[in-house]
Amino acid sequence: MPVGSGAESVAAESVAAEVVTEAPVTEPEPEDPLRGLEMRDLEAMRLRDLREMARDENVSGYSRLKKEDLILLLLKEKTERKGLSFGGGVLDVKSEGIGFLRSSRYATGARDVYVSQSQIRRFDLRTGDMVVGQVRPPKESEKYNSLLRIEAVNGIDPEFAKHRGHFKGLTPIFPRQAFHLITSPHNYTQRLLELIAPVGKGQRGLIVSPPKAGKTTVLKRIANGISENHPEVHLMVVLIGERPEEVTDMDRSVDAEVISSTFDESEAHQVEVAEMALARAKRLVELGRDVVILLDSITRLTRAYNMVVSSSGRTLSGGLDPAALYPPKRFFGAARNIEEGGSLTVLATCLVDTGSRMDDMIYEEFKGTGNMELHLNRRLEERRIFPAFDVIRSGTRREELLLGRETLRQVWLLRRMFSQMMAPKPSGAGYDIVAATEALLKQLRRTRTNHGFLDKLTKDL
């Protein structure tokens, strides 16, 4: 055996040992682009960049989303990659200071998420806020899921949301911008409505209707006109005490947020849904948004309050408690155009000629509280003349703020002509409302636009 062979073998064994004990080299994990992103970072990005990020991260269903919806989708993807759940809903703050995120039609449900008092105080959260964030499942002694971290409030960064103003502190002014409701030359409901009772942003309107006069159809046409011509408006249809099949039909007919509590549900549930819908609208207006609520009907909402509120010890005609009038008046009175920006428009249907003294009393209490009224006529409905608008009784206060000077002059001329057609003649050959309305609709059908109709009316004189 050579002299150096022993030393060489020992060295070889030590090198082998080092090779065996050396940690294997691993490739570093690629950094997740979504990991460090917050709501404010995503808001600062352009829509094109957000879509590129969603495509690169293999997020499905992003191509047709608006910016705010795409941001929420990316936040959801970020949360789920951490192994957590992502949830949210409309906040309902209780008197104890805690809150719950309502996920089912603005009403209490088994999937509600608990929000702690500290989170509500930190971000100045209010009833009606749309809150989304990281959610954990309930522990053994808990009933609801709990909100761990708030990612967004009403679609914006929660740190910015806590600096918004309060609805009561905003300055109400008259409506100054009219809604364009016409979607087709053949939609005579919208065309006639824009002439006799224009609707502006911030309008407080009452649609007075006997049964079967087409009030639901009028609401649908208004909703379709707003959603098609004013996509920036947040449209809410609130159905209280309606039939379930009508709720389904409305949901399929309009591109709007449909909130409902049908007649077979309790009065307390109907009141809860209506109040949550109003609170949701107020929170959006505080952010400068334009919101429209179509309420069907304020009569049934008042009836529900009449069963829920504590008795005042007094009773009006028809069994109506005076205390039951204050909450629906507060709902209707919330409509306003905001000087600082934003508006809340409320168009509510009111039932008359139902044979109920209570319904007549409710109408008498709300008559004159709005700044726009649209009356539907029973005689026109009986003759199946639609839209069954009572032109003489319908109108908008301060319509000169919504119509141009020339259009206003022509509309006044139209009203004078309609009144003369209905005035009784000495010979007994005067027109009644049926003949006058038929003549008006006949002339309206001969033109494709309201401007053409008014110009033709002026030239014929």
Task: Identify what each model region corresponds to.
Residues 54-58, 62-71, 85, 112, ...:
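Conserved glycine-bearing catalytic or ligand-binding loops at nucleotide- and phosphate-handling centers
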Residues 59-61, 107-109, 121-122, 138-141, ...:
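Short beta-strands and strand-coil junctions in structured, solvent-facing domains, enriched
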